[in-house]
Amino acid sequence: LLSGMVNECNLDPIPTSVNKKSDLCVSPKMIDTKKLKVAVSYDLGFAPMSKLCKDTFDKKLNKINNFFHSVKFAHPEMINADKTFYLLRGIGFVNDFSEINNNNPGSLGSVIVDELKRASSISIKDIGWAMSEHTKIYRNAEHFFEEYDLLITPAASVPPFKHEEEYPKEIDGIEMENYLKWEAISYGVTLFGGPAIVIPCGNIDGKMPFGIQLISRKNSDINLLDVAYSLEQKFKGNSDLELI
């Protein structure tokens, strides 16, 4: 939702259009969700997702399908999202933390130091590939949102877990290759360049909160807030959809 909070600035080397600030002075409003053509996906074609979250997502879809004009399983093509994201993230880590690590060894946490070590192996060829692939994924998303108004996924790959557990080491018996992988359903959509928002959608397994992730095209931040607000209002009073 960043484009809903920033102004244009000539100091930005890669300027982009932003929302009018007057839009932010207005409270979210109810819209007719029956006009929305919606795509849904368990995993965007690449993200790990537990069976429990898939099954819960199915149950929620059965309850909300009639809120929309149409609902179809679909997502933008992004088979190389993992590699693209990790490479671009690595470049950012080198820029943000390498000087600190060099000047003050031991001042950074082990996770950041490990990321810097991995990033040090990135080549110019890797960077070129990642930038090219990011452009492909971004354009795939733009074309996708010409057909659909909204993309909905589960908000997380696993139910809430204990605070003492650093991150899920495995999902349904499949080992996660790193500490980020379980968050793929969230970091994948950052490659679209558009807004995403998570709203509560009842409970999972009758116990903990369950959320759905709403994603839309670039520069549709204000509209997405209206969609999220409208769905939250529709969920009220429904024990299967309202957070209890």
Regions inferred by a protein language model and the residue ranges of each:
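Short helix-loop capping/hinge segments that flank enzyme active sites or metal/cofactor-binding pockets
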Residues: 27-41, 88-142, 154, 158, ...
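A short helix-breaking turn/cap at a secondary-structure junction
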Residues: 1-55, 234-244
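Short, surface-exposed loop/helix-turn segments at secondary-structure junctions
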Residues: 129, 161-182
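Short glycine-rich, flexible loops that bind phosphorylated cofactors or substrates
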Residues: 47, 159-160
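Small-aliphatic-rich amphipathic alpha-helix that forms the alpha element of a beta-alpha
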Residues: 142-143, 176-199
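Short amphipathic alpha-helices in soluble, non-transmembrane regions
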Residues: 227-231
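Short, well-ordered beta-strand elements
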Residues: 208-217, 224-225
